A protein has these predicted regions:
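N-terminal "arm"/small-domain region of PLP-dependent enzymes with the aminotransferase-like
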Residues: 1-32
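PLP-dependent aminotransferase class I/II
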Residues: 10, 39-44, 49-55, 120, ...
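Short, glycine/acidic-enriched loop or turn micro-motifs at the edges of active sites
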Residues: 11, 91, 112, 140, ...
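Phosphate-binding glycine-rich loop
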Residues: 32-83, 97-109
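Short, well-ordered alpha-helices that flank and scaffold nucleotide-derived cofactor binding pockets
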Residues: 70-74, 96, 100, 150, ...
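Conserved coil-to-alpha-helix start sites within the AMP-binding
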Residues: 89-95
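Active-site phosphate-binding strand-loop segment of PLP-dependent enzymes
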Residues: 113-201, 207-209
Length: 333
């Protein structure tokens, strides 16, 4: 029986091996492993992709989010005890970044048709302590609507994007600055380049993207021990830098983003065409949005575990995203 892996990182990286090796040879020849030309290039290309003014490469997606909230605290935009609205269905990293900075996560429910944050539910959670709403573009689907802009303007809250799963996606609705690309819709966005992502590193890597110059400067300093210049530490910072090896991998893969996305769309179209079982709820697709299919998520409301067992017996791996949501994790009960 043929076995179908949920994901093969070896197969995912095979098309780019020669380019990656050539880039790594440049790094070995240069002897420059941090703050080099590949990280600088990656930052420029990410900012351009999102139609944003600034990008800061960093160590991973969680640190990208942590740096965003830490920067807002250092800038006086937020203070300990302030609230951040987060979707109830997301990876725990989205919430860890909030609590790590002394902020309070407030969980809002999702829209079952999109699996993303329900902005009507989010509005009901807003209080005088609310300083931000986190939108997570889950599974590669843009989490955006005119309501996001309305809430930001009406309540004066920041919109923080968790764009870990949706690089290259875009919304049919314009963002706060008139752009449509995820990562440039809100005030600031965090990216993850964990190996399983659409654009994945050979280890951990992340980035922060924003058009707010002051915020970008604070994030950059905080990621480098809090230093704005060498041996001049304006913050009690962290060590959250991206090394040149990971930056080089990401530069290579980012150059292939369009073909990677097209391939994912083609596979999603096959699923759409051939999944006809009425007990399986397929993803809702908005034709005006650009969905990048980080995952092809389905719901089997009545017989999920039985369905997974059936798939496993036929050699097909599946997973649950997420088996235990953050608000039910022991650390957040």
């Amino acid at each position: 029986m043929k076995h179908y892996q949920f994901l093969s990182l070896k197969k995912a990286n095979e098309p780019y091996v020669d380019e990656i090796r050539a880039a790594w040879e440049q790094i070995l020849d240069d002897g420059w492993y941090l703050h080099g030309k590949f990280a600088a290039r990656l930052e420029r290309e990410l900012a351009d992709l999102c139609h944003a003014g600034h990008a800061v490469a960093c160590s991973n997606g969680l640190d990208a989010l942590r740096l965003i909230f830490r920067a807002y605290v250092e800038m006086g935009v937020m203070q300990r005890g302030d609230e951040v609205i987060v979707p109830a269905n997301t990876y725990v990293a989205s919430v860890l970044a909030v609590t790590d900075n002394g902020l309070v996560p407030v969980f809002a429910d999702i829209d079952e048709t999109t699996m993303n944050l329900d902005f009507a539910q989010a509005e009901q959670k807003i209080t005088s302590r609310t300083k931000a709403i986190m939108v997570v573009h889950l599974y590669g689907s843009p989490c955006w609507s005119p309501d996001a802009v309305r809430l930001a303007e009406r309540y004066g809250v920041k919109i923080v994007e968790d764009n870990a799963q949706a690089i290259g996606a875009s919304s049919r609705f314009a963002g706060l600055h008139g752009t449509h690309a995820t990562g440039g819709l809100g005030d600031v966005a965090a990216f993850s380049f964990y190996p399983t992502k659409n654009i994945g590193a050979m280890g951990d890597a992340g980035a922060v993207v924003t058009s707010d110059k002051q915020l970008a400067s604070a994030v950059r300093a905080l990621a480098n021990y809090g230093a704005d210049t060498r041996y001049h530490n304006i913050y009690r910072g962290l060590n959250c830098r991206m090394d040149e090896l990971q930056a080089a991998v990401l530069c290579v893969k980012l150059g292939h983003l369009e073909e990677i996305t097209v391939a994912r769309r083609e596979r999603a179209a096959i699923y759409d065409a051939h999944i006809r079982n009425p007990q399986i709820v397929k993803p809702r697709i908005f034709s005006e949005d650009v969905q990048v299919w980080h995952q092809y998520e389905i719901r089997v409301p009545k017989r999920r575990d039985e369905f997974r067992d059936y798939m496993a017996r036929h050699g097909v791996e599946t997973d649950i995203h997420y088996a235990v949501p953050p608000h039910l994790q022991p650390c957040y009960r």
